[in-house]
Amino acid sequence: MYEYIKGTYMGINKEYIVIENGDIGYKIHSSGYTIANMPNIGEHIMLYLTQIVREDFIGLYGFGSKEELELFNKLLTVNGIGAKASLSLLSITNVENLKRAIVLEDEKLLIKAPGIGKKTAQRIILELKDKLDVNLDEGIQTDSNDIKVSSKILEEAKEALMSLGYSEKECEKALKNVEEKESLEIIIKESLKFLMN
């Protein structure tokens, strides 16, 4: 139904980001990777969208690239994989690395995603490895960020990260490695970058 949204980035609210467009604030669920690459609050942004409609839920899911949206949709075709698990997978690394992990049958990377066990990782590989286009000549891409935390907003940041599917232990480790920052959004972004490496 929706292709994309352009609007003003208004911030993160635990389980979603908020984009304002035409005086309406849209709640958009997204991956840790997209959230980590959000601009500063008040800046303009464009996200590629899909809508999920269930009996008890209607939600928008937005991503920074068409490739990430396409991979999200492909992950949803895997038996037993829902939106939460797909976002969890897309939060551990960038799109190319995730596709490469699936094609090369790298279960170890897939099970780093909260909520993804060995059997689920094997099912993802089995159902998607022949359906993904990936350049196997390129090496694994990494974004390194050495990052310490301010205790003032530590709890809020931890809750936001846990709502993305990370364990309490993973969140605490990431937050310990983040520099003291002035805003919750920056702390979450930097923590996500740490968690994806």
UniProtKB/Swiss-Prot annotation:
It is found in: Cytoplasm. Residues 149-197 are annotated as: Domain III. The keyword Protein transport does not apply. SUPFAM superfamilies: DNA helicase RuvA subunit, C-terminal domain, Nucleic acid-binding proteins, RuvA domain 2-like. Residues 144-149 are annotated as: Flexible linker. Keywords: Cytoplasm, DNA damage, DNA recombination, DNA repair, DNA-binding. InterPro entries: DNA_helicase_Holl-junc_RuvA_I (IPR013849), Hlx-hairpin-Hlx_DNA-bd_motif (IPR003583), NA-bd_OB-fold (IPR012340), RuvA (IPR000085), RuvA_2-like (IPR010994), RuvA_C (IPR011114), RuvA_C_sf (IPR036267). Residues 1-64 are annotated as: Domain I. It comes from the Bacteria. Residues 65-143 are annotated as: Domain II. CDD domains: UBA_RuvA_C. One of its GO terms (cellular component) is Holliday junction helicase complex. Belongs to the RuvA family. The RuvA-RuvB-RuvC complex processes Holliday junction (HJ) DNA during genetic recombination and DNA repair, while the RuvA-RuvB complex plays an important role in the rescue of blocked DNA replication forks via replication fork reversal (RFR). RuvA specifically binds to HJ cruciform DNA, conferring on it an open structure. The RuvB hexamer acts as an ATP-dependent pump, pulling dsDNA into and through the RuvAB complex. HJ branch migration allows RuvC to scan DNA until it finds its consensus sequence, where it cleaves and resolves the cruciform DNA. Homotetramer. Forms an RuvA(8)-RuvB(12)-Holliday junction (HJ) complex. HJ DNA is sandwiched between 2 RuvA tetramers; dsDNA enters through RuvA and exits via RuvB. An RuvB hexamer assembles on each DNA strand where it exits the tetramer. Each RuvB hexamer is contacted by two RuvA subunits (via domain III) on 2 adjacent RuvB subunits; this complex drives branch migration. In the full resolvosome a probable DNA-RuvA(4)-RuvB(12)-RuvC(2) complex forms which resolves the HJ. HAMAP family: DNA_HJ_migration_RuvA. Has three domains with a flexible linker between the domains II and III and assumes an 'L' shape. Domain III is highly mobile and contacts RuvB. This is Holliday junction branch migration complex subunit RuvA. It comes from Hathewaya histolytica (Clostridium histolyticum). The gene is ruvA.
